[in-house]
Amino acid sequence: MRSGTALRAAARNCHRPRRSHVPRRRRPGPVPASTGRSDKIDETAEQFTRDGAHVIPVRADLADADGVETVWQAVEKTGRPLAAAVLNAGRSIGGAFLDTGLDDELSLISLNVTSVVHLAKRVTRHMAEHGEGKILITSSLSATLPTPYETVYGPSRAFTRMFALGLREELKEHGVTVTCLMPGATDSDFHARAGMNNTAFGTGAKKNSRKVVARQGFVAMMEGRAEIVGGDAATKRSAIEHRFLPETYKAARHATKAKPRPHR
């Protein structure tokens, strides 16, 4: 990967980047990093700086079109070609569809789907113009099954998966690779922020290491792979299993894990 700018756009509950994932001889220039409206963006920038990286923190609401443009303007201000982009923004909402708020779900779609398309439009045109680049788009293992009690989240991740794979085919002739990362349940605050602590995905549940998942995604992006399931061997087996199981069976099984438990 040539020396240039790298972009990481993520919601604040997603995996934090680790500079150690970038080989020293290939480390890019400035890294505009957005983690939504959270003050964790400053912590992320400090972590990168301690490792000798030049990070430009950008606080922006990626569920809003103006927020996406703010991030892209930060990329343009570097004055350097964009070498790599990680589109990692996303969140879930737990609970029965009858009980969840419509505004919350429309906001989820804006973040998980609309912002990815919006930012990808800017990123892909820029990279195609320069004739090279690498893109990592985060989907989820949830893209491979119906997700009752996360009824809007799963379909949003199915979209990003197919979007990434479609883009990959289009951009081949322009020297740009697109990789889709599909993590299983990961040890971040993702499920807590989705209001799912009173489910099988809550506190104490066995989950994949976010450091391992981040490294797997980075390596796959650098190798130009089409997609990778992020997580341990059991997670990867689940992805294979999902290809053959009936959708109704997968839906029922997910419901037993994601359905809120009665308060005792």
Where in this protein do the model-derived segments appear?
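Canonical Rossmann dinucleotide-binding motif of NAD(H)/NADP(H)-dependent dehydrogenases/reductases
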Residues: 1-32
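Substrate-binding pocket helix/loop in short-chain dehydrogenase/reductase
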Residues: 96-98, 104-109
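SDR active-site lid
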Residues: 168-233, 237, 243
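Active-site helix of classical SDR
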Residues: 120, 156
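Rossmann-fold cofactor-recognition segment
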Residues: 48-66
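Conserved NAD(P)H cofactor-binding loop of Rossmann-fold oxidoreductase domains
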Residues: 88-93
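Residue(s) in the substrate-gating loop at a strand-loop-helix junction
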Residues: 140
